[in-house]
């Protein structure tokens, strides 16, 4: 009876990126991290991060440092859709520009190695309505309302 009353403790799957857990990823240098990334990301990091990318990382670190404990950091807005998500960015809030507005994205460990632009869609998906006049030959017989 006591066993039934005791709730089963939920176990969550520990995140790993290509077999390496998040704590180890945070301790790695860029050179070690590059070995885990796919070819496109390796090439990009080997060519180096530019001044704008470094300033984004600096602003993200500052926002994380100034955030109160157990709170989400302040949103950092950026136009850098081509920035590769690095392990040190995990937990940050980024406003990614889609050409019109800044979409808020919370960076999760599963996003490591992807680009920021992948999480901020630049177009409005099509919601197909009824066909209009001239859409097809059969649409001529649809009565106009």
From Swiss-Prot:
Glycyl lysine isopeptide (Lys-Gly) (interchain with G-Cter in SUMO2) crosslink, residue number(s): 108
GO biological process assignments: positive regulation of signal transduction by p53 class mediator; ribosomal small subunit assembly; ribosomal small subunit export from nucleus; rRNA processing; translation
Molecular functions (GO terms): MDM2/MDM4 family protein binding; RNA binding; structural constituent of ribosome; ubiquitin ligase inhibitor activity
Annotated localization: Cytoplasm
Main location: cytoplasm
Sites of N-acetylalanine modification: 2
UniProt keyword annotation of Acetylation present: yes
Domain of life: Eukaryota
GO CC, alphabetical: cytosolic ribosome; cytosolic small ribosomal subunit
InterPro entries per record: Ribosomal_uS19, Ribosomal_uS19_CS, Ribosomal_uS19_euk/arc, Ribosomal_uS19_SF
Record key words, sorted: Acetylation, Cytoplasm, Isopeptide bond, Ribonucleoprotein, Ribosomal protein, Ubl conjugation
Entry's family note: Belongs to the universal ribosomal protein uS19 family.
PANTHER family for the chain: RIBOSOMAL PROTEIN S19P FAMILY MEMBER (PTHR11880), SMALL RIBOSOMAL SUBUNIT PROTEIN US19 (PTHR11880:SF2)
Job description of the protein: Component of the small ribosomal subunit. The ribosome is a large ribonucleoprotein complex responsible for the synthesis of proteins in the cell.
Subunit text: Component of the small ribosomal subunit.
Protein name: Small ribosomal subunit protein uS19
Taxonomic lineage from the root: Eukaryota, Metazoa, Chordata, Craniata, Vertebrata
């Amino acid at each position: 009876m006591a066993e039934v009353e005791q709730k089963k403790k939920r176990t969550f799957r520990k995140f790993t990126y290509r077999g390496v857990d998040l704590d180890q990823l945070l301790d790695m240098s860029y050179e070690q991290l590059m070995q885990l990334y796919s070819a496109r990301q390796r090439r990009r990091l080997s060519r180096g991060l530019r001044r704008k990318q470094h300033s984004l990382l600096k602003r993200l670190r500052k926002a994380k440092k100034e955030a109160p404990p157990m709170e989400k950091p302040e949103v950092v807005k950026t136009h850098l859709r081509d920035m590769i998500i690095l392990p040190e960015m995990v937990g940050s809030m980024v406003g990614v520009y889609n050409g019109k507005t800044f979409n808020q994205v919370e960076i999760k460990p599963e996003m490591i190695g992807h680009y920021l632009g992948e999480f901020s869609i630049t177009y409005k998906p099509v919601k197909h309505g009824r066909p209009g006049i001239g859409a097809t030959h059969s649409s001529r017989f649809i009565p106009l309302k």
